[in-house]
Structures are given as C-alpha cells and as structure tokens.
Amino acid sequence: AFYICSKITKNNSNIRPHIIYSLPFTSVIDQNYEVLKEIVENNINKEISSEDLMKFHSVVPIEYENFEGYDARFCFENWQSKIISTTFVQLLNTIFKIGKNSIVNRFHRLANSVIILDEVQAIDDKYYKIISEFISIMARQYNCYIILVTATMPMLLDTIDLIEDKEKYFRKLNRINIINNSESEITLDEFEDIVLEDILENKDKSFLIVLNTVKSSKNIYKYLKENTDRDIIYLSTEIYPKLRLEKINKIKNRNKKYVVVSTQLIEAGVDIDMDIVYRDFSTLDSINQTAGRANRNGVGGKGIVKLYKIVDNDRRICNYIYPRYLLNATEEVLDGKYIIEEKDIYDCNKEYFLKVKNRLSNDTSDELLDLIPKLQFKKFRDKFELIENDEFRRVDIIVNADNITSSIIQQLENDNEIDNIDLKNKFRILRQYTVSVSRKEMSEI
C-alpha cells in the first residue's frame, strides 16, 4: 500500500493518497493495531500521531490529537488521518450509505485512496456481486486502488493477482495436515471423549477446539474443565470484547501450552499459533481459516487439524449456522479425502469456489442494483446491511467488570450535564464491556 501511494504521488504531486485498512471485526482491529502502528512508525521514521494513523470503529472513543470537542469529532468522523484502520461495516457503509448522517462528510476521502480489505472471505456472499460492481466503479471513477487480502480468495470477485504463479507458493507450504473424519457423524458426547483422550495423551501440546454454536462450545468447555487439570481458555461472543482481547493476548504466550475452546470468532485475523486443532464441520473457507491457527509460524513440527461432523438431537450442528449449498459443496470437495496436506488446499479451494459460484444466488445484489436507476436511494441504504440487525431478538448487557465501568456508570446515573461528545465517548468505552444475548437468555438471567 505504501508503494502504491508513492507511485500515485510520483505521477501526480498534487495527490496525497490515503490508506484505508479494513478488517471484518473490531476485535481483530484492536489485536492488529499495535503491529500496524509499529509498521507505520518504521515507515515514516517518527512517532505517529492521529494525523498519521487512526483507529475508527464503534468502540473507539472520539479523539484526535490537538483538537477537542466538536473539532476532534469532525476530524475523527471525516477520516482526516493519512491511514485509517476500520471495519468492513464502516468502510462499506461509507460507500453504500452515502447521504446518511456523518457518512456523507467522509465519502470524498475515498478518492485517490488505497483501500485494503483484509480477510475479504468474511463478507456475506450474497453481497459479492454488488460489492464487486461498486469497487470497480471506485477504481475506475475515483482513482482508488483496491487490495483484497485472504488465504482463501473467493473466485467470485474479478481481481488481478499481484503475485505471479501463486500456485507455486501454495504448493511449497507444508505446515499442517487436515485429518478429515467427517465421513460419518458423531454425537457431542463422543466428540468430547475423543478430544479429552487426545489432550491427556499430549500434555506438551496446545489445543484449539472450534465449535459452531455457543451452546456446544460451552458444553465442551465445561466437560474439559471437569476432567483435566490443563489451563483452559474459553472464547465466544458471550465474553465481552475487552476480556476477549486479554484472553487472546494470553494465548499468544508461546511459553505455555493452553487448551482453547472457541466459536468461529477465532477464525478471521486472530493471530494465535496452536499445535492441534479440532473443528466441527463447516464450510471449506471456514475450515481453512481455522486451519490457519495450526502451526501458524511453521515451528515445532507439523500442525494437525482434525475435522468432525457433530450432531445434536439427530441434527448436524453445522446446519444451524451455514447455508446448505455451501455445506454440500464442502462435502463434495472433501469426499474420499482423508488426509489433506497444506499443499493440496489451494486446489480444494479452487474446486470449492467453482461449485459455490455455480450455486450462488445474486438475488440480493440484483435487488439493490435495481434500486439505483429508480433513484430509490433511501430504500437502497436501508436494504444494505452487512451485519443483519437483530435488535428485536437480542439485548445488550453491560458487564460492570472493573473500576472503569463502575466510574462511567456512576457518572451517567448522577451527572445530567454531560456534553454530547463526552457522552458518546463514555458509551463507546462501555461497548468494550458489552455482550449481546437473546431475549430468551435475558429472561433466564
């Protein structure tokens, strides 16, 4: 991205391109921000300020160096920094929801920019067509350079590969083996026994067990806690963001061999390195992302990824989460393959995405595209939701976990004269301590 920016400036000294680095989730941005900060400081040879690099998402307090109040809010919401680290939701809302609130004030910052979408496979495939159309327009009309980054690139977007003969590099990879045990189904109880036996036999190995639902992940976490003295860490969306980040940083300690039980949140951009990985059956791109947590750094022998198909009440748990056509495509690709070496994953991905492309429905994208010539922009904005809004089915709970939350809650309860910016910042901080639960779960608390 720095190289492309320098080329743009060299060709036209009047243009000062921005870099917009987007990731799927706020938690991933928070994990990667310090690394990004170090890279930027090394590139510009000085300590950075808000003018150089800014983190922008719903949990970040509104701050901008040398400015206060509404001036800080203006610089923050208008993306005045040279490098913006943000989420897919914020980036794509800036493109698709122009005309709404403060978004209109930052749309112009996209022109002449280098836009990076990291872990692009995390985007819902029903939006692939319209996103492809719009980023093509951004490239042609607004002089944007779009970089899509993923180890499992969907062949559903028209792109130019920056690496020639990329297959050659994939075929040299030899860090992991995927052991496919998904030809038959097993119960969660049977899966628990298999995992426990492996953990007891390999006390010098770290383990990652990834389940498809919070319920199944909590069940196996409880079972392992009761039956082994290993240090077990649990991760899911039921853990508030600040604590999740602390747990992930703890897992990164290579001097200790943890057992980690998690939902799929571990997949995209979470930089941990485990020896043995277990995965409940899912779509191939999701399996590959989980496999990326095994022997990530290529040290300590070959990593093992063990794939199982778990059932609950005679129904596959994966069917609760993933579209049937994606699971079918995965089953067809893996059929007859017991051991899949890392060098063979590229061909599996290629076959998988060809199958997906032939079965993918573009109805949602087509409906959105049809609204544009009709000038139905409000309906267009309202219909595009990268993350489905289920506020009527879920409730946010603030966990009063430490002195920070206690102090903020006390101020909100007692101070009626908090200015608007300060109020926004306090709620942004509280989002780091917020979990979302279903209304049914809420009634049981």
Task: Describe every region a protein language model picked out.
Residues N42-K97:
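Inter-Walker segment of RecA-like/P-loop motor cores
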Residues A139, D193-L200, D204, V210, ...:
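C-terminal helicase lobe and adjacent C-terminal extensions/tails of nucleic-acid helicase motors
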Residues A1-N14, V35:
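Walker A/P-loop NTP-binding motif
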Residues V89-N93, I103-M138:
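SF2 helicase catalytic motif II
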Residues I15-E41, H57-V60, M155, V214:
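Conserved Walker A/P-loop ATP-binding site and its immediately adjacent core
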